[in-house]
């Protein structure tokens, strides 16, 4: 199983999600915004899943997803948005960028693990 990258500008959310995933035996990296996340994706081919917020400074999560697909040409990494946003137009933009799941905060850690397991099956 590959690594999971958590991209969120909130250290509380990053720590909570990462802690839950590590307890479930998964290897986790973190990034503070979309720009940092994209940089980590450029340099680590073992990342298989990105769990990402939408609203972040420097680069938002949807822009990061679009750049991952268009600029890096990476279609192998699965992307799940973990966000307070539930706007249908944002979800459509995410779908167009290859986002595979949309989890609305507050979340249950089990939902992230379950979604990852479905995507890796």
PLM feature spans:
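Receiver (REC) domain active-site loop signature in two-component systems and cognate sites
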Residues: 56
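Active-site beta3 strand of CheY-like receiver
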Residues: 45-51
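Short, glycine/charged-rich "phosphate-handling" switch motifs in NTP-dependent
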Residues: 100
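Active-site residues of response regulator receiver
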Residues: 53, 83
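Short hydrophobic/Thr-rich beta-strand motif most characteristic of the beta2 strand and flanking loop
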Residues: 25-32, 40, 103
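C-terminal output helix
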Residues: 107-116
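Charged docking surfaces used in two-component/phosphorelay signaling
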Residues: 15-23
């Amino acid at each position: 199983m590959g690594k999971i990258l958590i991209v969120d500008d909130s250290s509380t959310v990053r720590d909570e999600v990462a802690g839950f995933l590590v307890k479930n035996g998964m290897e986790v990296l973190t990034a503070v915004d979309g720009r940092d996340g994209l940089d980590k994706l450029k340099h680590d081919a073992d990342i298989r899943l990105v769990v990402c917020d939408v609203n972040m400074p420097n680069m938002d999560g949807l822009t990061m997803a679009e750049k991952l697909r268009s600029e890096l040409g990476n279609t192998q990494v699965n992307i799940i948005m973990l966000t307070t946003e539930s706007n249908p137009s944002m979800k459509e933009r995410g779908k167009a960028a290859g986002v595979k799941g949309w989890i609305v905060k507050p979340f249950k850690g089990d939902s992230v693990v379950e979604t990852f397991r479905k995507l890796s099956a």
